[in-house]
Amino acid sequence: MKLFSKLGIFKKRIALIQDNKVYTYNDLINRSSKFSKIIKKNSLVILVAKNDIESIAFYVSSILNGYFLIILDENTNKEFFFRLTKNFKPNYIFYPKEYIDINNKNQKIFFSNYCLEKIDKKNKVINKKNSIILTTSGTTSNPKLVRLSNHNLFTNTEQIINYLKIKKKDITITTLPMAYSFGLSILNTHLEAGATVIINKDPIYSKNFWKKINDYNICSFGTVPVVYQ
């Protein structure tokens, strides 16, 4: 089994809410399918991710279509980003338009506030067992890369769903970037279970955050100790 392979069964259930706008699972799948029409399977791609519908749709598309995905946070050091791009030579990069201003002749396609840039046409020799690479925490120094296989991604997600008894009726809220393992895990488990994720950009100590907790009847949220400091 592959992660997200059963998203279609949830259809009109609410997958995501961002800035009071509702996205069903059908909406998420339709947005994800836009990328599969452009990017070939087994492509090597880099996602500079924000917690928003476009990054999540691109991530879901990457998993479903077998891209080998490197996920970076939107605050990733630019020097590290360019070095990573030079070393890995990805086929495509998907990034927020404000992240970098690249003036070159590469093919570019724009999706809302994002740019999909074609970098390298050559086919990559990729182990099909691999799925994604995440960076360790820390964006100003030289973070290390952590590789996750398709199998690990799926089994870990299913184990967490079963242990925490996450159900379709559950509603959670984002508190961490999806580029980090814990933030991504919260997204994976709730989407895989057919639950609802509130996309949030407010810090947990803000009034707006706790207003969302009340307004959306949030069941639970996950975070790390450093967030409270």
What are these regions (language model features)?
Residues 1-13, 128-131:
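A short N-terminal helical cap/helix-turn-helix that marks the beginning
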Residues 24-25, 131-158:
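Conserved AMP-binding A3 loop
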Residues 98-99, 204, 217-229:
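Adenylate-forming
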Residues 21, 35-75, 175-177:
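Conserved AMP-binding/adenylate-forming
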Residues 9-39, 81-82, 148-151:
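Conserved AMP-binding/adenylate-forming core of the ANL superfamily
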Residues 82, 103-131:
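Flexible, low-complexity linker/hinge segments
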Residues 4-5, 53-71, 82, 160-162, ...:
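Hydrophobic alpha-helical segments in the ANL/AMP-binding
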Residues 154-171, 181-220:
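Conserved AMP-binding/adenylation subdomain of ANL enzymes
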